[in-house]
Amino acid sequence: MLDAQQETYVEKISFILLNQPIAQCNASYNGLAHLKSQIRRFVNSQEKIKLLLPAFPCKTNNLDKVLSHTPDLGEYVVLRKFVQCIRDIESVYEPGVTFYIFSDYHTFSDYISVDLDHHYDYSDNLRKMVANMNCSDALKIVNFEHFDEFSDLKDTEYFDGLREKFGDPDYAENFTELKLKNNKMNQTYLGLKKFMNQDQKFVLAPLSYKDRRRRLADIAKGMMVQGKALDNFLQQKFADCIRLSIHEHPMIGKKYSLFLFHERQFKTPWHSTLLFDASRGEFIIDSKENHLKRSGVILPVTHDGKPWCYLQLSAADEVHAHALRQIRAELQHEKSGLYLECPVNRASLDMLLPKELSQLVKEFGSVLLRGFAPLADAEQLQTWYLNHRSAVTWAYEVNVQAFKGSTGEQPLHWELSCPPAYMAVHPHRYQYEDYTPHEYAVYSVASPDSNTWTVVDAALAVLTINGQEREQLRNTIMHYSNFSPEHGGNTLHPLVRYCSTSRQDVLRWQDFQHAQGYLTHLEGVSELTEQSRIYQRLNTLCHDPRVCFEYRLQTGDLLLVNNLTTLQASHTSSMHNEYWSIHLQPDSINSPWQPHNRIVEQAELTSA
C-alpha cells in the first residue's frame, strides 16, 4: 500500500507519460489502470521507472525517403523529446528513469537490405546524440550483443539466432492458415507487403512482376515471424518494463503507442526527412522526394559535414529564387547555430524575408548571414530588419546602437535582463515577457581583427542536467543590480524559467559577478561557499562545448539572435572592431514601448 506522497508520484509520472510520449490510441480505462499499476510497482520499491521501445534499426536504403544512412535532425528531434520526458520524470521522482531503445536491425536484417556497417554507424551516432544531451545514463541504446544468450554468435548470426532461440515454430509453419482465420493478422501482412514494396523499390526493381510479388510475400511473412521471436525475447529480458511501440495499438495495457514527432501521426525518422518551412515556422515530416517537389526554394542543410535537413524559403521571383538556391546552409550544433552563406555575387539582403528569418531564429536560436551585399548605414539596417515591426527605443530615442572596440564587450548575458532606469520598467507593472526582446540583430560594420560572439543554447543547457537539479535552479533567484550612472536598475530572475514562446525550460544566468557596474547575489543563499558553488556550476554548464559555440564575425556579417532561448557574450581584440545592434520589441500588449504605456510614463514623469 502506497502512502499519499507515493500516490502523488504515480499520478505525476502517469501524467507526464500520457502528456508527452504516449499517443493514447483507442484508450480504455483498463489501459490507464494497468499503466498506473506498473508505475506503482516501481514507486513502491523506489526503483527507476523502466521504459522499453524496440525501434531505431537503421536508415532505410531508399534514398527517395532519406538523406543518407546516418542519423540526422529527425533522429535528434525524437531523442530530444525522449530526454525531455526523462528530465520531467526525474524532476518529480528522484530515482528517475531508465529508457531502453532496443535496436531491431538484426531482427529484420535479411529483409531490409542495409549493410551491417551502416547499422553500426547509425547506432553509434545515435549514442553520440544522447551523450551530447548528457543522458547516456538514462537513455540506453541496446542490441542483442548486450545479452549473454547471443554471446556465442557473430553479429551476422543474430538474425537466425533470434528465430532459433526465441521463435515460435508453430506460428511459422502454420502462418498461411493462421492468417486466413485472423483478420488483424491478415491486415498486418497486407500492410507490410504494401509498405515494403515502396520501401524496397530499388532492391526489387530488377525482379519480374511475379518474382517481386513472391519476394514481398516472403518478406512480409518473414518479418512477422521474426517479430514474434523478438516479442518473446523482449518479454523474457525486459519483463518488468513499460512496453512502448512505434506502431498503433489500442491502449489496453499491453503496448503503449508513441507519436515520435509532435505531429500526431505514426512516422519514423529512419523512413523520412525533416524540412523546416520558414513561412509557417514548423517542421514538415515527409520523404526527401516529396520535399524536393515543394514550391519555393529548398535548401539542403548540413551538420558536421553530413546531410541534416532541408529549409524552405520564399522567393519573390525566379531571379531571387536562383540567388537563394546558391546559399550554403550549415548548423553548428544539432539544432542550433545556423549559418546562411551567400558564396557569390554579394546578393542583397532584400531577397530574404525578415519574418522568415525570425522563424529560423526562433527555431535554431541564432542565424548568421554571411557574404551578402553590405549595408550602407544604420538606417538601412533598421528599414530592412524591422519590416513593419517595432524596435526597442534606447536613450535619446535611438533604435540602432553603435559599439566600437571594448564598448561592445559583454560577459555572458541576455539582453535587457536589467533594463536601464530611464526605461521605467517597474516590476509591479511589467513582467519578464513584457520587456524582454525576443530577438535582436548585430551587424558587423568593421571587423579587421577577431570579433567573437559566444552563444549558449540555454534550452539544451537545461536539458543536460538532472530534473532534480533543474527544479532547484528554478527555485533559485538571482538578484541583478546595475549601479552605473547611465543605467541603474534592479531585477530578480530565477535561474531556470519556462519560455512560453518556445515551450521549453531555459537557463537565465548572467556572468556579471565581476562585471563593472553590476552586482549580483543569490536570494536566500547566505553562505559564500554555496554561492560560489552555484556560480561555478553555472559557469561550467554554460561553457560546456556541447551547449555553446562561437561565431567569429567578419566585416559585413549579420547575426540574428533569439534572446529568449540563448545566452550571449561578445569579445573583441581590437579597438577598430565596430558593430550596430537593433532589438525587436516584445510581442506583448503590455510592453513598455506600447503607446498607451509610454503615455502613462510621461504623465508620471510630468506629475513628479
Q: Which residues fall in each region the model found?
A:
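N-terminal regions that are enriched for targeting/export leaders
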Residues: 2-79
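Short loop/turn segments at strand-loop or loop-helix junctions that form parts
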Residues: 45-64, 100-109, 141-149, 443-445, ...
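Hydrophobic beta-strand segments of well-ordered beta-sheets in folded domains
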Residues: 47-53, 92-105, 139, 232, ...
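Histidine-anchored nucleotide/phosphate-binding helix
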Residues: 74-94, 354-357
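A substrate-binding/cap region within the structured catalytic cores of diverse enzymes
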Residues: 105-265
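Non-heme Fe(II) oxygenase catalytic core, chiefly the N-lobe of the double-stranded beta-helix
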Residues: 300-551, 565-591, 596-608
